[in-house]
Amino acid sequence: MKGLLQRVKGARVEVAGEVVGSVDQGLLVLVAVEPDDTPASADKLLHKLLNYRVFSDAEGKMNLSLADVGGGLLLVSQFTLAADTKSGLRPSFSTAAPPALGEKLFDYLLSRAKQMHGTVASGRFGADMQVHLVNDGPVTFLLQT
């Protein structure tokens, strides 16, 4: 499972012009599920997302986690993040989980996040989404389980 996290001052996801998820300060995370992923993969990614130290402390060092600052978590499914881009000029999606597995594990991740963190929002799995964000930094990390 991959999570491309971006520290944001705010972010929102729209589907057909309707806002379906938004957060203020926090993390926007694009999530890709791969064929061998399990609920344990999702739990490991969630632990990292909530505890990865990407927010600045009083001295300006990245020493604070999402949990420490009480920021929002916006999860957006993005199967293209799992693409194989090693050869050719067209990405292959054979390294992405089938849609049924992807949706099941994304929903599991979202459910667990809502149990463990205060402010959690999401996009809509499989939908054509427009993602709006104000990057903070920018600070971006690719986390893999």
Swiss-Prot record:
EC annotation from Swiss-Prot or TrEMBL: 3.1.1.96
Primary subcellular site in the record, as a coarse category: cytoplasm
GO molecular function: D-tyrosyl-tRNA(Tyr) deacylase activity; Gly-tRNA(Ala) deacylase activity; Ser(Gly)-tRNA(Ala) hydrolase activity; tRNA binding
Lineage summary: Bacteria, Pseudomonadati, Pseudomonadota, Gammaproteobacteria, Pseudomonadales
InterPro entries xrefs: Daa-tRNA_deacyls_DTD (IPR003732), DTD-like_sf (IPR023509)
UniProt name for this protein: D-aminoacyl-tRNA deacylase
Function: An aminoacyl-tRNA editing enzyme that deacylates mischarged D-aminoacyl-tRNAs. Also deacylates mischarged glycyl-tRNA(Ala), protecting cells against glycine mischarging by AlaRS. Acts via tRNA-based rather than protein-based catalysis; rejects L-amino acids rather than detecting D-amino acids in the active site. By recycling D-aminoacyl-tRNA to D-amino acids and free tRNA molecules, this enzyme counteracts the toxicity associated with the formation of D-aminoacyl-tRNA entities in vivo and helps enforce protein L-homochirality.
Record NCBIfam families: D-aminoacyl-tRNA deacylase (TIGR00256)
Motif (Gly-cisPro motif, important for rejection of L-amino acids): 137-138
Cited PANTHER family: D-AMINOACYL-TRNA DEACYLASE 1, D-TYROSYL-TRNA TYR DEACYLASE
Cellular component terms (Gene Ontology): cytoplasm
CDD domains recorded: Dtyr_deacylase (cd00563)
Family: Belongs to the DTD family.
Originating gene: dtd
Biological process annotations from GO: D-amino acid catabolic process
Compartments reported by the entry: Cytoplasm
Keyword entries, A-Z: Cytoplasm, Hydrolase, RNA-binding, tRNA-binding
Catalytic reaction annotation: glycyl-tRNA(Ala) + H2O = tRNA(Ala) + glycine + H(+); a D-aminoacyl-tRNA + H2O = a tRNA + a D-alpha-amino acid + H(+)
Chloroplast found in the keyword field: no
Gene3D superfamilies: D-tyrosyl-tRNA(Tyr) deacylase (3.50.80.10)
Organism of this sequence: Pseudomonas fluorescens (strain Pf0-1)
Domain remark text: A Gly-cisPro motif from one monomer fits into the active site of the other monomer to allow specific chiral rejection of L-amino acids.
Assembly notes: Homodimer.
